[in-house]
Structures are given as C-alpha cells and as structure tokens.
C-alpha cells in the first residue's frame, strides 16, 4: 500500500506539473482595451518584444488589492527595468456604470499611471484562463518574457509572493 501511495503521488505531481506547463505556454488573449487615459491598446501587442508584468483584478476586491502589488513592484529596484501594466476586468459591470467606475479609478492617479492602467470589457473567460483565476477576490500577477511567453504567475498578497516574482524576473534577465 505504501508503494502504491508513492507511485500515485508521483503520478499526481507529474500530471499537475504538465498541466501547469500547458498553461504557461498559452498565448495571451488579443483583447482590445482602453487605458484610463483613453488610449486604445491591445496588451498582447504592447508587451511583445520586452519583459512585462501584468497585475490584474477580476473584481472590486481583487482590484483594490492589485494596487499594493503595483506599489511594491515600482519600489523594487530589481524590477525597475520591467514594464508594468495594471489590468481591470469590467466585463461583468453594466456598460452604463463603467464610466463611473473608470472615473473613480482615475482619482489620485498621474497621467503616466493612467497610461499603464488598462480596462478590459470583453473576453473575461479567456483572461481568467490566462491568469489561472480561481478566486476573483485575489489580485493576479503574470511575468511575461520578450517573446510573449508567461514565465511566472501568482495570486494573492504582494508581501507573500513578490520575492518569487523578483526571482523569476532575475532568472529571465
């Protein structure tokens, strides 16, 4: 029985690892969005050719927690050369409310910060798959290499996961 448990555990770990690799190889959705400054943008296009970090919120609560990630990434000298975009998914919000939501997001943000904050209103399921969303109340983070390949993903508190992001970015450099 003990050897069965070892073999079963090894097979389970292998299958989880292979499933994870399939997710990392997946292409980013080519969804058109808009920055808070009003510029039309396709994230898959603008991040291609250089390393980038995407920090996404898929709910109000997740979006509020994403701000802590942005602060920590910008304060970390090891991540200084990496382009960072904050992403808010508003597909579920009624269209007549989206303008008010975006107005609230803009408050207290400089024009430069607004240029790096992307609002998406379609393809939510594709983005949830890309980020590996399980709990939309968490912020989700992806590190993407210059070829557009996802090399690290995480979700949760920045204080817990930022060292992993930094290590992944350092390995990629």
What do the predicted segments below correspond to?
Residues 1-7:
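Positively charged n-region of N-terminal signal peptides that target proteins for export
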Residues 9-21:
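Bacterial N-terminal signal peptides
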Residues 22-44, 114:
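N-terminal "domain-start" segment that seeds a small globular fold
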Residues 46-66:
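Short active-site neighborhood of thiol/selenol oxidoreductases, capturing the structured segment around
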Residues 59-62, 90-94, 124-126, 149-150, ...:
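Solvent-exposed loop/turn segments at secondary-structure junctions
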Residues 62-110:
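Structural microenvironment flanking redox-active thiols in thiol-disulfide oxidoreductases
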Residues 85-87, 100-136:
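Short, internal strand/loop/helix patches
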Residues 128-129, 137-173:
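Thiol-/selenol-based redox modules, centered on thioredoxin-like
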């Amino acid at each position: 029985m003990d050897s069965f448990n070892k073999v079963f555990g090894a097979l389970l770990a292998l299958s989880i690892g292979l499933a994870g690799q399939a997710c990392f190889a997946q292409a980013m959705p080519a969804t058109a969005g808009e920055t808070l400054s009003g510029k039309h943008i396709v994230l898959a296009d603008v991040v291609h050719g250089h390393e980038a970090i995407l920090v996404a919120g898929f709910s109000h609560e997740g979006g509020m927690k994403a701000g802590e990630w942005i602060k920590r990434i910008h304060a970390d000298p090891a991540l200084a050369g990496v382009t960072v975009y904050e992403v808010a998914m508003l597909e579920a919000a009624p269209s007549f409310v989206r303008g008010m939501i975006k107005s609230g997001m803009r408050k207290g943000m400089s024009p430069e910060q607004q240029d790096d904050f992307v609002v998406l209103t379609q393809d939510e399921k594709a983005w949830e798959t890309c980020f590996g969303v399980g709990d939309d109340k968490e912020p989700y983070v992806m590190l993407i290499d210059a070829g557009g390949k996802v090399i690290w993903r995480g979700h949760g508190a920045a204080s817990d996961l930022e060292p992993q992001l930094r290590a992944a970015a350092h390995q990629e450099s």
